[in-house]
Design a protein with these regions (language model features):
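Alpha-helical transmembrane segments
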Residues: 6-37, 64-92, 97-109, 140-350
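Alpha-helical transmembrane segments within multi-pass membrane transporters and channels
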Residues: 35-46
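Membrane interface segments of multi-pass transport proteins and intramembrane proteases
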Residues: 46-56
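Individual transmembrane alpha-helices with interfacial aromatic-anchor signatures
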Residues: 57-61
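Extracytosolic (periplasmic/ER-lumenal) interhelical loops and adjacent juxtamembrane/interface segments
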Residues: 92-133
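Glycine-rich adenosyl-nucleotide cofactor-binding module
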Residues: 125-148
């Protein structure tokens, strides 16, 4: 239940420094509390009730869906949630003058590899006509929010299986989102990078700074050999914070790239789960989540599943060599750093 320490380390500075009337601050606090309570209940059942299954999956998913609906509907109906779609910086008398368009409630989002970095979800529903296209876009966006919150929080939860794994990866992702939040909150910087300016998103900078600081402090004691563990209290909440902050900044479509490690953890878990449930003879990974694949020898896999085959057997004499968890963790960090760097580079690739 070390995740309680992470949550406390986030909430105290936010409550002291943040603007509590900001809708963005309130959404992030709600995310922390809802998923924190959900994760704590799961840890409590596992630890004190001695039930290794913990909270029922339907209850856990229900909590994630509820949070996703709260976030999505708040973004839809709160008058305080608006963006500035176009910001121009003009030079007059050797001075920069910022020219902004009116703040609007928008269904636009940031998408990499395209000329203006923008995708309007309403464009996907032009077939419905001008009367319905924006309403359908918001319905889609709310459902997408629910999916992203559930997917990223579960991905973070699956990633928490080795000392320092989830805390290190999440700190890197959080630092990237912190930089994006700063850019989104600054009209001049947003204009230079051709990104949306989001008034009030400076409160996300405060929250994400506390988030990254809490994770780095936790990593000090969670690195191998770990003295403390975050449990579901920490891992579920961390994923939710990453998801909701990206959605608020209209950067949710960057998450498959930025959180690629979480994505592959989910894929590996689905692959192995499908294999076990349906009695398949072949699977891609030896074990799930993905990080466990790298510390499972091929001989151990064959002992457990003698009549089964696997795509990625591993390397070494007889495919029996496995990596130490420290090496696996550091390599996962390196992959996350590369994904974070590439995520930022996408703004210059058109």
């Amino acid at each position: 239940m070390g995740g309680v320490i992470i949550l406390t380390s986030i909430l105290i500075p936010v409550l002291l420094v943040g603007k509590l009337h900001s809708v963005y601050t309130l959404l992030m606090i709600a995310t922390t509390l809802v998923l924190g309570i959900l994760g704590f209940a799961d840890d409590y059942i596992k630890t004190f009730k001695h039930n290794k299954d913990g909270l029922k999956p339907k209850v856990k998913l229900g909590g994630q869906v509820l949070l996703g609906l709260i976030v999505g509907l708040t973004l839809r109906f709160s008058p305080a949630v608006q963006i500035n779609e176009t910001v121009e910086v003009k030079i007059e008398n050797n001075k920069e003058i910022v020219v902004k368009s009116p703040d609007v409630k928008s269904t636009r989002t940031t998408i990499p590899f395209v000329k203006n970095h923008n995708l309007n979800y309403a464009d996907l529903f032009r077939w419905a006509g001008p009367k319905w296209m924006y309403n359908l876009a918001w319905v889609f966006l709310v459902l997408l929010t629910v999916f992203i919150v559930a997917a990223v929080s579960n991905g973070s939860n699956l990633n928490d299986g080795m000392d320092g794994m989830a805390s290190g990866n999440s700190a890197i992702i959080g630092l990237t989102l912190l930089l994006l939040a700063y850019i989104s909150s600054n009209a001049v910087t947003a204009s230079h990078l051709d990104l949306m300016y989001i008034p009030g998103s400076e409160e996300l900078v405060v929250f994400l700074a506390a988030f990254v600081g809490a994770l780095i402090g936790f990593l000090w004691f969670n690195s191998f050999p770990a003295q403390i563990f975050m449990g579901d209290t920490g891992s579920l909440t961390i994923g939710g914070i990453i998801a909701v902050s990206a959605i608020i900044m209209h950067k949710e479509l960057l998450l498959p790239l930025l959180c690629g490690v979480f994505l592959f953890e989910i894929f590996a878990n689905f692959d192995v789960g499908h294999f076990v449930k349906h009695g398949k003879k072949h699977r891609i990974w030896k074990k799930a989540p993905l990080h466990d694949h790298f510390r499972t020898s091929y001989s151990d896999f064959k002992k457990a599943w003698p009549n089964s085959t696997v795509t990625f057997k591993g390397r070494g004499d007889g495919f029996n060599n496995v990596h130490h968890e420290v090496k696996i963790t550091i390599r996962f960090w390196i992959v996350t750093i590369l994904l974070a760097a590439f995520t930022l580079l996408t703004f210059k690739i058109r």
